[in-house]
Design a protein with these regions (language model features):
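Exposed, flexible binding/inhibitory loops of compact, secreted disulfide-stabilized domains
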Residues: 1-70
Length: 70
């Protein structure tokens, strides 16, 4: 399914950086997506979307897992 999406699909290099930095980087590198910062323990919907990247952050606002399109 993700192969149908345009542009960069994942950002492993952003694990460990501040969520706001990751959000801006993702949107700059793939203008087709909207990056959304969410707490790492939050439960989101399971619908796959090519225009969304969830940026999961820990309690300190640091990216805790690889942001991916979906």
């Amino acid at each position: 399914m993700s192969s149908d999406c345009q542009g960069k699909q994942s950002w492993p290099e952003l694990v460990g950086v501040r969520g706001e930095v990751a959000e801006a980087t993702i949107e700059r590198e793939n203008p087709a997506v909207n990056a959304v910062i969410v707490p790492e323990r939050s439960i989101g919907d399971t619908q796959f979307r090519c225009d969304r990247v969830r940026v999961r952050v820990d309690d300190n606002g640091i990216v805790s897992s690889v942001p991916r399109v979906g």
